[in-house]
Amino acid sequence: MPDRAQVIIRIVPGGGTKTLQQIINQLEYLSRKGKLELQRSARHLDIPVPPDQIRELAQSWVTEAGIYDESQSDDDRQQDLTTHIIVSFPAGTDQTAAYEASREWAAEMFGSGYGGGRYNYLTAYHVDRDHPHLHVVVNRRELLGHGWLKISRRHPQLNYDGLRKKMAEISLRHGIVLDATSRAERGIAERPITYAEHRRLERMQAQKIQFEDTDFDETSPEEDRRDLSQSFDPFRSDPSTGEPDRATRHDKQPLEQHARFQESAGSSIKADARIRVSLESERSAQPSASKIPVIGHFGIETSYVAEASVRKRSGIFGTSRPVTDVAMHTVKRQQRSKRRNDEEAGPSGANRKGLKAAQVDSEANVGEQDTRDDSNKAADPVSASIGTEQPEASPKRPRDRHDGELGGRKRARGNRRDDGRGGT
C-alpha cells in the first residue's frame, strides 16, 4: 500500500505584523497587487476585498487590537497583530477541492470558537506552484474578548497535532486523503529540514541550473586539450625558431619588472644606510649635533630628528635618542638663546618706557626738594649743588618719592653741622 500524502500546515516564522504599514504590505503581497482575490472570513459571508479597500481593512484591524498608538515609534512595537499560516496540498490535488477544504478548515479553527475564541481572518488561494496552497492571515485579537491568538504545543485545541488532524478530517470530506500521523508514528527519527534550509536549497539549485546553462566554451576542444597537456614554463621557447614565443615574452615581462623593483628597493635601503652612517659620523665629529639643521618633511629638524626619520623610513631601529627628547632639548635651547640675545640687545620698548618714566619721576622729586630747601640752598651754594645731584636711576626699580626727600634733608643737616651754623 503506497504511503499517503501528509498534511502540511506551516506557521510562517516572523510572518506576523506589528504596524499598520506591515499589514498593508502583507495583504498586497498575498493579493499580488490586486491580481488575486482576498476573501474575508465566513462571518463576513466570504466577501472578497477590493484592492482599493486594503488600507481601510488594515486600519480596522489595527483599531480592533485596542493597543495601537499612532504616536509610538515602529521600532518600539513588540506585539504581533497578525499570524500567517500556510495550508499546502500534494502536487496534482484537485484545485477546487483543495480550496474548499482549506477554507472550511480556516472557518472551523478561527471563526467557530473551536479554539476558545473567534477571530477575523483573510485568505488568499495560490496555484502558482505544483502544489496548491492557501494563505491564512489571522487577526490575533479576539472579536468577543480581550485575549490573543496563541498556537502552541500545550494548547488543548490550537496545537500543531490538532491543526493537522482537523485538516485531514475536513479534507477527507472533500475527497482528499491525507495522513496526519506524526513523524515518530511513521518511524522518522532525524530532524526535519526547516523552511529556511529548504529555501536555501532552492536558491542553490536555481543558481546551479543558471550556471550550467551559461556557455563558457570560447575555444575549440583541441586547443583545450593541448593547453592542458603542456606544463607551464615561463621560459618556454618556440621549437621552430628557438626563441621565446609571444606568450613567453609576455610572461617574462612581469618577472623582469619584479626583478627591477627588487633592485631599486635594495638600492633605496643601501642609500638610507649610507645616510644613517654619515649622520652618525657627523654627530660624533660635532660636540653639539643638535645644532646642525637638516631639512626634513616638517621643516628644519636637528640631526637627531633627521636620523630618527631616516631610521623610520629605512626600517632601522637602534638605541638613539627619542625624537621627543630631541624636540624638548631644541625648544629649551631656543629659549635660552632668545633670552641671551635680549640681554645683549638692551631693554625692549616696554622696558625703555619704564626707565624713562622713572627718570621723570626722579626729576619731579628733585624739583620738590629744591622748593622746600630753597633758603638752605641760597645760604650754602655748595650744599645746594650737592642737593641737586641725583644718583642714576636703576633700570629695575624707580626711586621712591619719600626716599628722595629724607636723603635731601639729611644731607642739608649734615652740611649745616659741618659749617657750624646749626644742627644738634
Swiss-Prot record:
Positions with biased composition (Basic and acidic residues): 243-261, 394-408, 415-424
Annotated Acidic residues bias: 212-221
A Gene Ontology BP annotation from the UniProt entry: symbiont-mediated induction of tumor or growth in host
The name this protein goes by in its record: T-DNA border endonuclease VirD2
Known function: Tumor formation by A.tumefaciens involves the transfer and integration of a defined segment (T-DNA) of Ti plasmid DNA into the plant nuclear genome. The virD operon encodes a site-specific endonuclease that cleaves at a unique site within both 24 bp direct repeats flanking the T-DNA.
Alphabetical UniProt keywords: Crown gall tumor, Endonuclease, Hydrolase, Nuclease, Plasmid
Enzyme nomenclature, EC number: 3.1.-.-
NCBIfam families referenced in this protein's UniProt entry, alphabetically: PRK13863.1 (NF010437)
InterPro entries found in the cross-reference section: Endonuclease_MobA/VirD2, VirD2
Region Disordered: start-end pairs: 206-269, 321-424
Biased composition (Basic residues): 330-339
Species of the source: Rhizobium radiobacter (Agrobacterium tumefaciens)
One MF term in the entry's GO annotations: DNA endonuclease activity
DNA repair listed as a keyword: no
Pfam families in the cross-refs: Relaxase (PF03432)
